[in-house]
A protein has these predicted regions:
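Glycine-rich phosphate-binding/catalytic subdomain of phosphoryl-transfer
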Residues: 12-18, 25-26, 30-228
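Short glycine/proline- and charge-enriched loop/turn segments
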Residues: 7-11
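Short hydrophobic alpha-helix segments
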Residues: 2-6, 75
Length: 228
């Protein structure tokens, strides 16, 4: 057993609680390097490969990307209470509680605010989903983390189709080029194949180039939800 860590703190910018992409990657790289150092110190082994990897991170919030994979607006974390109108309207529409912090509430609030970026959305995800995507190329999310984006059908263990349809009907007059299911990650449950670490992903985690690609990665999950 070995460990590595990194301390970070969110920042308030333009009245939005956020982390930059640089914060995310520098923090992950620092944690990984500290893990490598711990393995070397304890066992005199240079870490190049592990049996499997999993990511868990803060749930909810809003990370929206265009078709080129570019972040459209700064990451809006779960701490933001800026979606009151959207949360209220969706709760009434779905007859299901949609808290302000959920990604669906953030998306609908951006629509209500007539934010320019909404028409360009190709993919929305959580922090764990973002990291997993960049390291594996897979746009997937564990069902636990997914349940903090949009309502889940507990029978199918997938997005609630009825509520997806209601959302699409609600925003149809806006004429966006997407349906909501098309921009959400694919939902997976524990044990399902979620991809492997790519060459690019390995270099993102370990810029020294020692970490090998091909390591299986489990579905990304919410707070402390992965591999525990």
């Amino acid at each position: 057993i070995a460990s590595g860590s990194h301390d970070w703190e969110n920042r308030l910018e333009n009245n939005i609680w956020t982390y930059t992409l640089e914060d995310i990657w520098s923090g992950l790289q620092d944690s990984y390097q500290n893990l490598v150092n711990d393995v070397k110190e304890k066992y005199d082994i240079t870490l190049t490969k592990v049996g499997s990897i999993g990511f868990s991170a803060m749930m909810h919030g809003y990370m929206a990307f265009d078709k080129d994979g570019e972040l459209l607006v700064p990451f809006r974390t779960w701490r933001n209470t800026m979606t009151e109108q959207a949360a209220k309207e969706l709760t009434e529409l779905f007859r299901f509680n949609m808290p302000q912090r959920w990604s669906g509430a953030h998306l609908y609030q951006a629509i209500l605010n007539k934010e320019e970026h909404v028409k360009d959305i190709d993919f929305i995800t959580t922090l764990a989903g973002y990291v997993h995507w960049k390291l594996t190329g897979e746009k997937v999310l564990g069902v636990g983390d997914a349940s903090g984006m949009f309502p889940i059908d507990s029978t199918t263990r997938n997005w609630n189709k009825e509520m997806l349809a209601k959302f699409d009907e609600l925003v149809a007059p806006k004429g966006y080029p997407w349906k909501v299911e098309d921009i959400l990650p694919k939902v997976l449950v524990a044990g399902e194949k979620a991809g492997t670490l790519t060459e690019e992903g390995a270099k993102l985690l370990d810029p020294t180039g020692k970490l090998q690609a091909g390591i299986p990665v489990c579905p990304p999950e919410g707070d402390a939800g992965t591999g525990m």
